[in-house]
């Protein structure tokens, strides 16, 4: 399996001297979806910024596709252009990414800098249609709903066909319909062979991941989402599904519960197995 990122003993301090990350080690592989979980202030967004080359660690090493990622390397215009084409960052607040007069202009911004005008127009129109927001192309981004803005910000990244997509809380503050649409998008990214790293508090979203890391300055857990229930979830400030809370309560009451489901389908599966025993 091709290694996309490798972080070795990465530490980072904020300008005020407080620690954001402390000796973080992790690996991310091609075509993986990896979730980064943890309480507020755990360093999750800082980690994404390091993966995106927006900030660099005070200590430790970051490798992208086997090559060391440094400030000096990204000062090279050609290397920076290639890295930016391969890696896209979707910020938690889409407003920070939206600064053009229309949705079409937003999505076309990067293609117009990377491709010929003809190809840029073609790629932009295709992206808008694929994302089902072509009808919004002449609208001003600030007049859109939260879910529509999120789709536009994701479209801005997809228009340059990145291989890696970094997403900071992609479903936060969205209504259930918009949340479901974003989750389906993330599923489609994996099907297209893309690598996705997402920061989230939402266990339902994290269930899309092949693996997850729990951060609290350091890596305190690495593994499958279903194995998270061995940790103190209250301390991690995670959005735990109600069905999971129900099974945790039943287990604490003494019932023979060996698995904690995250989705309704998983819960039905577990209950069916229990009924078969009686």
Curated annotation (Swiss-Prot):
CDD domains: ABC_cobalt_CbiO_domain1. Keywords: ATP-binding, Cell membrane, Membrane, Nucleotide-binding, Translocase, Transport. Gene3D superfamilies: P-loop containing nucleotide triphosphate hydrolases. One of its GO terms (molecular function) is ATP hydrolysis activity. Disulfide bonds: none annotated. InterPro entries: AAA+_ATPase (IPR003593), ABC_transporter-like_ATP-bd (IPR003439), ABC_transporter-like_CS (IPR017871), ABC_transpr_CbiO/EcfA_su (IPR015856), ECF_ABC_transporter_ATP-bd (IPR050095), P-loop_NTPase (IPR027417). ATP binds at residues 38-45. SUPFAM superfamilies: P-loop containing nucleoside triphosphate hydrolases. Its main location: membrane. It comes from the Archaea. Residues 5-242 form the ABC transporter domain. PROSITE patterns: ABC_TRANSPORTER_1, ABC_TRANSPORTER_2. It is an enzyme of class 7 (translocase). GO terms for cellular component: ATP-binding cassette (ABC) transporter complex. This is Putative ABC transporter ATP-binding protein MJ1572. It comes from Methanocaldococcus jannaschii (strain ATCC 43067 / DSM 2661 / JAL-1 / JCM 10045 / NBRC 100440) (Methanococcus jannaschii).
């Amino acid at each position: 399996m091709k290694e996309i990122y490798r972080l070795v003993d990465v530490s980072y301090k904020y300008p005020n001297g407080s620690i954001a990350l402390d000796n973080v080690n992790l690996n991310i592989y091609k075509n993986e979806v990896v979730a980064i979980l943890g309480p507020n202030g755990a360093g999750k967004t800082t980690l994404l910024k390091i993966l995106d080359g927006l900030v660099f660690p005070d200590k430790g090493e970051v490798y992208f596709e086997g090559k060391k990622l440094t400030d000096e390397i990204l000062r090279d215009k050609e290397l920076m252009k290639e890295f930016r084409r391969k890696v896209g960052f979707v910020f938690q607040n889409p407003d920070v990414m939206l600064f053009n007069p229309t949705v079409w202009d937003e999505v076309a911004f990067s293609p117009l800098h990377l491709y010929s005008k003809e190809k840029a127009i073609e790629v932009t129109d295709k992206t808008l249609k694929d994302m089902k927001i072509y009808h919004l192309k002449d609208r001003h981004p600030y007049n859109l709903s939260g879910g529509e803005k999120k789709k536009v910000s994701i479209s801005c990244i997809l228009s340059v066909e990145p291989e890696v997509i970094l997403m900071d809380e992609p479903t936060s503050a969205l209504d259930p319909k918009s949340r479901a649409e974003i989750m389906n998008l993330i599923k489609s990214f994996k099907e297209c062979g893309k690598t996705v790293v997402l920061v989230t508090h939402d266990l339902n979203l994290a269930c899309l991941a092949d693996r997850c890391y729990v951060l609290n300055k350091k890596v305190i857990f690495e593994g499958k989402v279903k194995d998270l229930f061995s940790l103190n979830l209250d301390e991690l400030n995670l959005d735990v599904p109600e069905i999971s809370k129900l099974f945790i309560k039943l287990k604490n009451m003494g019932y023979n519960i060996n698995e904690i489901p995250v989705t309704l389908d998983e819960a039905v599966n577990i209950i069916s197995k229990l009924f078969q025993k009686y």
